[in-house]
Every structure is written in C-alpha cells, then in structure tokens.
Amino acid sequence: KVKTEILFIERCLALLRPGGRLGIVLPEGIFNNPSLAYVREFCEDRAFIKAVVSLPQETFNSAGATVKASLLFVQKFSDEEAADYRTKQAAARAEIDAKYQPIIDAERERLQTEIDPARKLKNLDRVKEVQLELRKYERQMAELKAREARQLLKERFPYPIFLYEAEHVGITGTGQQDSCELY
C-alpha cells in the first residue's frame, strides 16, 4: 500500500512541465525517513531538489494537524537536463557493473561448483541451501551496486540543495500571527 503523499508527489512531478517548479508541504517523515529513500530517489531522478525547509512542530496545530511538516521545492529537469542525467546515470551503472562483474561471476562459479556435486548425490537440502546462499549474495550485490552507482551519479551530476530548519513561520500553534523568517 502506497501512502497518499507519495502518490501525490509522483502525480505532481508527472504533471509538471519540463523546467517547471513545484513547492509542496509534506509530512517530515516522507523526505527524511531512511525507509522511504526511494521517494527521494524518485524525485532526484526527475527534478532538481532546490530546497527542503523543516517547519516547527506547531505550524499546523491551529488547523488540527499534529504532524511535523516540511516544504519541498523542486524544479523538473528540462528535456536536455533529463537526457544528460539519464546518460550519466547509465554510465555510472555501467561502470559499477563492470567493477563488480568479475567478483560476482567468481562467486557464482564457486557456488555452482558446490551445487553440481550435491545434485549428483541427490542431496536436495544442500542444493537448496547453496541456491539460497546464491540468491542472497546476488541480492546483496545488486543493492551494493545500486548504492554505489547512485553515489557516483551524485558526484557526476552535482547541484546544491538548500536545507533549513525554520523556527518562526508567521503563525503560532494557536493560529495567531508571528514573525516569519521564510522570506
């Protein structure tokens, strides 16, 4: 089940024209929760993240909302920027794949040399055990390659992201006007 906020981000980015800008209020956990890293990556793959501004806990208390919120500002890639990003992304993935392929092939071969004799001896438990080990290894290596490729892409497609923790946003927890440091 996908959270509504995540679907909303996806739809907003899909509807945004190339080069278009978007400002959106999100629950804070959506963009800074490690388990939702795929949301950040989804945005990074389509737009420049210009700024993330964390709002005080009480910002929306007067409206009945108790969740801490953030402002997310993005600018969708132009067609040229999107093409450049995809080219650099493909190059980063290819470089990381080439780096790890000999290691992965060697481990597959090693595990296959354990599977073949076990099959001949009809030791199905050992076959299943080694096949499980192989699948686990391949999954771990795929995750490692994805992390390293994303890091390499960030080095090759760098841009600044403004991060700010706001304390005064023009409204108090009771709904009264307050000073505002956001402009």
Predicted regions and their residues:
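A conserved structural/catalytic subdomain of Rossmann-like adenosyl-cofactor enzymes
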Residues: K1-Y183
